[in-house]
Structures are given as structure tokens and as C-alpha cells.
């Protein structure tokens, strides 16, 4: 049996290298329960991400526009550390945090280029959930 070089239970951690990307894509997925913001380089590799739950909101507060604003600001701040200055925005989903997330990306200092809605629409695919009776 070969001798162990590392102590048991110690994991080798690779540091995140600083990518220098000036232009990228911001993908905002806004569902009824949460908002996820991912900022990628043009080829689709994720540079930074944040979600309403990751920022610290729980339960029904994750679906609010304010939670989406905080998530977008957090993701934009992380992306700016990697040299990001300009983004094209792709919005997906029916949630309430769509416009707020775009506005907060601009407020955080990123220059927003094109805004595109890429919400998937079914050609009569899965049956939707039943209507709520309150």
C-alpha cells in the first residue's frame, strides 16, 4: 500500500482565479418562488451567481422584488471583481422580480446592452398545476 501524502479528511482547495472579462451575459431566472441571477462570459461559463435564498431570504420572502434586487446587486458586485463592465440580459420566467433585477444590475454599475425574454413556452406540453382555491 502506498504511503499517504495528505492527512485523512483534508481536502485540496483550488483558489478561484480572477478572470478578466469585460463583456458578458446576465441570466435572470425569476420563478414564482425564487429569483436566480447568473452572470456568465459570452461562451456561457459562470463568473458569478446569486439567488434570493443565497442572499438570506427564506420562504415566501424569496419571491419578492426586493429579494431579486438584492440578489442581482450581489451577483453584479462579484462580477465586477472579475472586470465585468457590460452585460446583455436574458430574462426567463413569470416571477415578480424580473424588472427589479434588471434595474439593480444597472444601479450596481453594469452597463446593460440588449434585454431579451427567453421564457420557454410549451406547445401544449405538460399539464399545468390546478387552480388555487383560496
UniProtKB/Swiss-Prot annotation:
<keyword id="KW-0699">rRNA-binding</keyword>
<comment type="subunit">
    <text>Part of the 30S ribosomal subunit. Interacts with proteins S7 and S18. Binds to IF-3.</text>
</comment>
<comment type="function">
    <text>Located on the platform of the 30S subunit, it bridges several disparate RNA helices of the 16S rRNA. Forms part of the Shine-Dalgarno cleft in the 70S ribosome.</text>
</comment>
<keyword id="KW-0689">Ribosomal protein</keyword>
<dbReference type="GO" id="GO:0005840">
    <property type="term" value="C:ribosome"/>
</dbReference>
<dbReference type="GO" id="GO:0006412">
    <property type="term" value="P:translation"/>
</dbReference>
<dbReference type="InterPro" id="IPR018102">
    <property type="entry name" value="Ribosomal_uS11_CS"/>
</dbReference>
<dbReference type="InterPro" id="IPR001971">
    <property type="entry name" value="Ribosomal_uS11"/>
</dbReference>
<dbReference type="GO" id="GO:1990904">
    <property type="term" value="C:ribonucleoprotein complex"/>
</dbReference>
<dbReference type="GO" id="GO:0019843">
    <property type="term" value="F:rRNA binding"/>
</dbReference>
<dbReference type="GO" id="GO:0003735">
    <property type="term" value="F:structural constituent of ribosome"/>
</dbReference>
<dbReference type="InterPro" id="IPR019981">
    <property type="entry name" value="Ribosomal_uS11_bac-type"/>
</dbReference>
<protein>
    <recommendedName>
        <fullName>Small ribosomal subunit protein uS11</fullName>
    </recommendedName>
</protein>
<keyword id="KW-0694">RNA-binding</keyword>
<dbReference type="Pfam" id="PF00411">
    <property type="entry name" value="Ribosomal_S11"/>
</dbReference>
<dbReference type="InterPro" id="IPR036967">
    <property type="entry name" value="Ribosomal_uS11_sf"/>
</dbReference>
<keyword id="KW-0687">Ribonucleoprotein</keyword>
<comment type="similarity">
    <text>Belongs to the universal ribosomal protein uS11 family.</text>
</comment>
Amino acid at each position: 500500500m502506498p504511503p499517504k501524502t495528505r492527512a485523512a479528511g483534508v481536502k485540496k482547495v483550488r483558489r478561484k482565479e480572477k478572470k478578466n472579462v469585460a463583456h458578458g451575459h446576465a441570466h435572470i431566472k425569476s420563478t414564482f418562488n425564487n429569483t436566480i441571477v447568473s452572470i456568465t462570459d459570452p461562451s456561457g461559463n459562470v463568473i458569478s451567481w446569486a439567488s434570493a435564498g443565497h442572499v438570506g431570504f427564506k420562504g415566501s420572502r424569496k419571491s419578492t422584488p426586493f429579494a431579486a434586487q438584492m440578489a442581482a446587486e450581489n451577483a453584479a458586485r462579484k462580477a465586477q471583481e472579475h472586470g465585468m463592465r457590460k452585460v446583455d440580459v436574458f430574462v426567463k420566467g413569470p416571477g415578480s422580480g424580473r424588472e427589479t433585477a434588471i434595474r439593480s444590475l444597472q444601479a450596481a454599475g453594469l452597463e446593460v446592452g440588449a434585454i431579451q425574454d427567453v421564457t420557454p413556452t410549451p406547445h401544449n406540453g405538460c399539464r399545468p398545476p390546478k387552480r388555487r382555491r383560496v
